[in-house]
Amino acid sequence: MKRISSDEVKKVAQLARLELNESEINQHAEQLEKILEYIKQLEKINTEDIPCTTRAIEVVNVLRKDEKKNYENSEEILDLAPSRENKFFKVPKIINE
């Protein structure tokens, strides 16, 4: 089994914005090795006759259908906003074009 180096764990921790001490680095290296060993075992399983799926459990949409409703006192709500433009809330731009 290939040993996962401390440098590899540190790199992954850096990408995940985690601060790890030496003890945690060693602990995570061991855990990652066990995970990779488990994946190797899974790769040996014959899945030739198993149909492809996107999920292990079927997902059903349980959301209600949207219904348009008029609100008579919309001005009251708009007046509570820190900033507005006509009949809309005005919010800071967060996506660059």
Curated annotation (Swiss-Prot):
Domain of life according to the entry = Bacteria
Any one Gene Ontology biological process term? translation
Q: Which UniProt keywords apply?
A: ATP-binding, Ligase, Nucleotide-binding, Protein biosynthesis
Is Thylakoid there in the keyword field?
Answer: no
User: Which positions are tagged coiled coil?
Assistant: none
A GO molecular function assigned to this protein is: asparaginyl-tRNA synthase (glutamine-hydrolyzing) activity
What chemistry does it catalyse, as a reaction equation?
A: L-glutamyl-tRNA(Gln) + L-glutamine + ATP + H2O = L-glutaminyl-tRNA(Gln) + L-glutamate + ADP + phosphate + H(+); L-aspartyl-tRNA(Asn) + L-glutamine + ATP + H2O = L-asparaginyl-tRNA(Asn) + L-glutamate + ADP + phosphate + 2 H(+)
Q: Does the keyword ATP-binding apply?
A: yes
How would you classify this enzyme at the top EC level?
A: ligase
Database matches in Pfam families: GatC (PF02686)
EC number from the UniProt entry: 6.3.5.-
**NCBIfam families per record:** gatC (TIGR00135)
Under the heading HAMAP family, the entry gives: GatC
Describe, as the record does, how this protein assembles with itself and its partners: Heterotrimer of A, B and C subunits.
What does the UniProt record say this protein does?
Allows the formation of correctly charged Asn-tRNA(Asn) or Gln-tRNA(Gln) through the transamidation of misacylated Asp-tRNA(Asn) or Glu-tRNA(Gln) in organisms which lack either or both of asparaginyl-tRNA or glutaminyl-tRNA synthetases. The reaction takes place in the presence of glutamine and ATP through an activated phospho-Asp-tRNA(Asn) or phospho-Glu-tRNA(Gln).
Q: Which family does it belong to?
A: Belongs to the GatC family.
PANTHER family given in the database record: GLUTAMYL-TRNA(GLN) AMIDOTRANSFERASE SUBUNIT C, MITOCHONDRIAL (PTHR15004:SF0)
Protein name, as recorded: Aspartyl/glutamyl-tRNA(Asn/Gln) amidotransferase subunit C
Q: Which organism is it from?
A: Prochlorococcus marinus subsp. pastoris (strain CCMP1986 / NIES-2087 / MED4)
